[in-house]
Amino acid sequence: MDADAPAGYRDPSGRHGAVTLPARPEPVAFDADATVLIVVDMQNAYATKGGYLDLAGFDVSATGPVIERIARAVAAARAAGIRVVWFQNGWDPDYVEAGGPGSPNWHKSNALKTMRLRPQMNQRLLAKGTWDYALVDALTPEPGDIVLPKPRYSGFYNTPLDSMLRARGIRTLVFTGIATNVCVESTLRDGYHREYFGIVLADATHQAGPPALQEGALRNIETFFGWVSDVAAFEAALSSDEARRIPA
């Protein structure tokens, strides 16, 4: 392990992380068997023209390369034995899970606001079973992956994520997906407060809104909540001799 990697990466059995990933603000080390790759909300809603974000006025024109880099990160993770967790954000077709007027989600969700302005969109945006809710065609879960629905921005809220991670001895969460400044950051922050180490692969994420929001979210994460790296560094770190070494 790189001498500059955080000391917190010594697990209770005394092992150091076998993988050292170049990152900001410093290199970060982890063990593949104690790590998951989280793919946040790579649904048509967030990454495809004609999906919710596009219809709500957000620019999704740059998501193609992000999808390609997520596919690379997923392939690298699988090859290294890192489990992949997929999130899909949304609600039942009647939007009971969205919370109703008594929930701030009803007032702040741009999907719900778009449907109130355009009633013809009702039961089409982020509704389970719809094209909008589905993952993009280029990203497909495989047997052994974990696929979880989530009703709010954070993947920890009202989901079994925490218990599933703890049961598997997971300590490190590597994030990709959309939107960096909303669901990615919300989930990473909640993980930080549950003692998980969070890493974002910046070029495998995309913001909702202007580019300044991407920069701000990444700066916030690297300063206060985690580490920021990229897909090429992730691939290289996982393919190193030490990372491939089977623990005794």
From Swiss-Prot:
Under the heading InterPro entries, the entry gives:
Isochorismatase-like_dom, Isochorismatase-like_hydrls, Isochorismatase-like_sf, RutB
Keyword Flavoprotein annotated: no
Q: Which UniProt keywords apply?
A: Hydrolase
Could you tell me the EC number(s) of this protein?
Answer: 3.5.1.110
Task: Note whether Lipid metabolism occurs among the keywords.
Answer: no
The residues annotated as the active site are D41, K150, C183
| GO terms for biological process, alphabetical | nitrogen utilization; uracil catabolic process
Q: Which residues cross the membrane?
A: none
Reactions catalysed according to its record: (Z)-3-ureidoacrylate + H2O + H(+) = (Z)-3-aminoacrylate + NH4(+) + CO2; (Z)-3-ureidoacrylate + H2O = (Z)-3-aminoacrylate + carbamate + H(+); (Z)-2-methylureidoacrylate + H2O + H(+) = (Z)-2-methylaminoacrylate + NH4(+) + CO2
Q: Name one GO molecular function term.
A: hydrolase activity, acting on carbon-nitrogen (but not peptide) bonds, in linear amides
What would be one Pfam family of this protein?
Isochorismatase
UniProt record similarity statement: Belongs to the isochorismatase family. RutB subfamily.
Q: Which PANTHER family match?
A: ISOCHORISMATASE-LIKE DOMAIN-CONTAINING PROTEIN, PEROXYUREIDOACRYLATE/UREIDOACRYLATE AMIDOHYDROLASE-RELATED
What is the stated purpose of this protein?
A: Hydrolyzes ureidoacrylate to form aminoacrylate and carbamate. The carbamate hydrolyzes spontaneously, thereby releasing one of the nitrogen atoms of the pyrimidine ring as ammonia and one of its carbon atoms as CO2.
Q: What is this protein called?
A: Ureidoacrylate amidohydrolase RutB
Q: Look up and give the organism this protein is from.
A: Methylorubrum extorquens (strain ATCC 14718 / DSM 1338 / JCM 2805 / NCIMB 9133 / AM1) (Methylobacterium extorquens)
Lineage in the entry? Bacteria, Pseudomonadati, Pseudomonadota, Alphaproteobacteria, Hyphomicrobiales
Q: Which gene encodes it?
A: rutB
